[in-house]
Structures are given as C-alpha cells and as structure tokens.
Regions:
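A short helix-loop
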Residues: 1-9, 114-116, 122-123, 129-204
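A glycine- and small-aliphatic-rich helix-loop capping segment at beta-alpha/alpha-beta transitions
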Residues: 2-7, 71-82, 87-89, 107-114, ...
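N-terminal phosphate-binding loop and adjacent alpha-helix
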Residues: 15-45
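Short beta-strand-loop/turn "lid" adjacent to the catalytic site in phosphate-handling enzymes
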Residues: 41-81
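Short beta-strand segments
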Residues: 57-59, 95, 119-124, 131
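Short, acidic/small-residue loops that bind anionic groups at enzyme active sites
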Residues: 78-100, 149-151
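Conserved phosphate-binding catalytic cores of ATP/NTP-utilizing and phosphoryl-transfer enzymes
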Residues: 89-119
Length: 204
C-alpha cells in the first residue's frame, strides 16, 4: 500500500511428492490454479478489508527475452488480466527474473539503483546467472546476461544432493541444517569455460 507503506506477502509451496525433484509443468499449472484463490483470500484477510487497488503487477514469463515461456505463468497473468479488466486499472507485466532483482533491491533499500547500471547475480533452482542491469525506456530495467551455468543450476545441484541424502524437495533448508553439524569442510572449485561455470561435477 503506497499510502500506508504497508507491504504484505503470502506464499505457499507447491506440493512435490517425496523423492521427486520438482513438478511437471502440467502439475505446476494445476497447483497454481488451485492455490491462487486461497492466496488471495489470505492476502486480503491480512490486509483487513477491501483494498483500493490502483494497479497490478505480474510476472508473465521467466526472463525478458524472446522465447522465454513456461505455462504456469499463464495462471498469474490470466488472473491479473481479468482483475485489471474488471476494475479498470492497468496491469504492469515484467519477468520473473526482474521481479527477483527488484525484490532484492527493495529489501536492501536500494531501489534507486534502477536509475544506474549495476551487476546482479540471480541464483536459484532454474537460474545461475551474472547479469548486467541498466536503465531502459521500454522496461523497468534492461537485463543482459554476462555469465551463466552451462549445465546444472545452483539450486538444482543443492536439490539433487539433498535427494541423494534422502531429504525432501526443496532441500536447501534441510541441507543447510545438516551442514551446520558437519565435521569437516570440503573445498570444491567449479569448472570455468569462457567465463561461464559448469556445476555438474559437484554432483558426481
């Protein structure tokens, strides 16, 4: 809420069966569709009544590049478009990646960085990128990939290692708890090729 400066967030992990490393897109679409109404109910319950919404922001694809597409993004985009049309308010669309970058800037109280070039690292289950970010007239920020992982992404590596240990996906939190009690530290170095990393060797 830009007037009260109130910021609310509700979230719920999508269910993944034990031993599996994620969801198929068809299952992800189903669970997004099923859980979105519940999330909206919780959000407005925590807000405390009817909200005077003046705009909607939504991630409609993974990255702002041609061909970037995942079906599960249609769930949020469709709901945002319906709400925008019904309420007569603008729907502002951006990528999932830019959403992560802006969230990091906001949490660090550095949103002013969108007015100047900066470097961002996007490290997740599907992405391990070094990104050059700069102001843009056509987008919130323009993102150019400098370096990436050529095989496994960092989050994939963590989850695969966790599943080998019998942990439940997503494995990051449980793996971190195990590491707190580790008896030794093992150093490992990623293979680099033309400035990009290869992480699959860690799994082996």
């Amino acid at each position: 809420d830009s007037d009260s400066k109130k910021l609310l967030s509700v979230k719920k992990l999508l269910p993944v069966k034990a031993g599996e490393a994620g969801l198929r897109q068809s299952d992800a679409v189903f669970h997004h569709t099923k859980q979105l109404p519940e999330m909206f109910g919780r959000l407005f319950s925590e807000y405390g009544g009817k909200a005077d919404i003046t705009a909607i922001g939504v991630s409609f694809r993974p990255r702002n590049i041609d061909g970037s597409y995942m079906p599960c993004f249609l769930c949020g985009e469709g709901l945002a478009d319906c709400m925008g049309a019904a309420m007569g308010i603008p729907v502002m669309k951006t990528s999932h990646q830019i959403g992560h970058i802006l969230a990091a800037l906001f949490s660090a109280d550095k949103l002013s960085h969108i007015n100047e070039p900066f470097i961002a690292f996007h490290v997740s289950g599907g992405t391990t990128d070094c990104l050059y970010c700069e102001p843009s007239e056509n987008e919130l920020i323009k993102v150019t990939e400098i370096s990436t992982s050529l095989d496994l992404k960092a989050g994939q590596l963590i989850d695969r290692a966790g599943l080998m240990l019998g942990l439940r996906f997503p494995c990051g939190a449980e793996l971190e708890r195990l590491s707190d009690n580790a008896s030794e530290t093992v150093k490992a170095r990623a293979v680099m090729k033309n400035g990009c990393c290869c992480l699959s060797g860690f799994e082996n």
